[in-house]
Structures are given as C-alpha cells and as structure tokens.
Amino acid sequence: MEKTLGLHILADLYGVDFEKIDHVEDVKALLEGAVKYANLSKLSSHFHQFNPHGATGVILLEESHISIHTWPEHGYAAIDVYTCGGKEKTFKAMEYIIKTLKPKRIDEKIAERGVVPVNPEGVNIEKMQLAQV
C-alpha cells in the first residue's frame, strides 16, 4: 500500500486576456485569491513586474507553493500549484485561477509527488531493517 505526500499541477494557460496578466498587482491578487479560495496557509510571497510587459510571483505556503509567470503579449501564463496533504486544495486553487483568467486553452500536467509506502501495522520498517543488518 502507498500514499502520496503531495500533488503538483503544472498548467499552461493560452488565450488569456492581456490586461489580466500584465500588471503585478493583478497577478498578486490572483494568487492571493487562489490561496484564500482553497483555504491554504500563506507564509510569504514575492512578486516582480517586468518591463514592458508581464509579471512573475510566488507564494510560499505551509503546504508548499503556488507560482505564476506571464507573457501577456502572447496571452500566456505558466501556473504551478503544489500542495502537501489534501489533494482537494490543489485542485481548488487551480480552479480559482482558471475561472478568473478564463483561458481559451489549457495544457495541464498532474504529478503525484512523494509516493511512499504505507505500513498499516505501524511498524517502523527502517528500524527493523537496521536491526537485521
């Protein structure tokens, strides 16, 4: 039996309205809205405005991170949402971003991170193996 420690969604959003992803203030509000909507826990954040267009930003979460990098001149945004614990929060954060940006096309990759064995008896396998060596 195995369990997954985290879920990572990488999304390429195409056909996004220029104005929604050009200014750092809007990009920051987008990610902070996703964090709130998904009930995630923000630790810190950093955002940057590019000249002449585009923005980038990351929010460090207790659960991991959420980030964006934009090319408004191409109507493109690269989104990264990775959380540990409940998968539903990862999907909820991405849902908020997609509903807000309304892209014409989405290319999404989903990866389960940290697939580890589960020992239902609660026995520490590592200690047992060390004792046998």
UniProtKB/Swiss-Prot annotation:
Modified residues (Pyruvic acid (Ser)): S64
Uppermost EC category: lyase
Mod. after translation: Is synthesized initially as an inactive proenzyme. Formation of the active enzyme involves a self-maturation process in which the active site pyruvoyl group is generated from an internal serine residue via an autocatalytic post-translational modification. Two non-identical subunits are generated from the proenzyme in this reaction, and the pyruvate is formed at the N-terminus of the alpha chain, which is derived from the carboxyl end of the proenzyme.
Pfam family name, one: AdoMet_dc
Catalytic residues, chain numbering: S64 (schiff-base intermediate with substrate), H69 (proton acceptor), C84 (proton donor)
Cellular component per GO, a single term: cytosol
Transmembrane segments: none
Reactions catalysed: S-adenosyl-L-methionine + H(+) = S-adenosyl 3-(methylsulfanyl)propylamine + CO2
Cofactor note: Binds 1 pyruvoyl group covalently per subunit.
Cofactor(s) this protein cannot do without: pyruvate
Site (Cleavage (non-hydrolytic)): E63, S64
Record's keyword annotation contains Lyase: yes
GO MF terms held by the record: adenosylmethionine decarboxylase activity
Annotated keywords: Autocatalytic cleavage, Decarboxylase, Lyase, Polyamine biosynthesis, Pyruvate, S-adenosyl-L-methionine, Schiff base, Spermidine biosynthesis, Zymogen
Lyase keyword on record: yes
Domain of life assignment: Bacteria
Gene Ontology biological-process annotations: spermidine biosynthetic process
EC number: 4.1.1.50
Signal peptide region: none
Recorded metabolic or biological pathway in which this protein acts: Amine and polyamine biosynthesis; S-adenosylmethioninamine biosynthesis; S-adenosylmethioninamine from S-adenosyl-L-methionine: step 1/1
Assembly behavior: Heterotetramer of two alpha and two beta chains arranged as a dimer of alpha/beta heterodimers.
NCBIfam families assigned to the protein according to its UniProt record, in alphabetical order: SAM_DCase_Bsu
HAMAP family linked: AdoMetDC_1
Name this protein carries in UniProt: S-adenosylmethionine decarboxylase proenzyme
Organism of derivation: Sulfurihydrogenibium sp. (strain YO3AOP1)
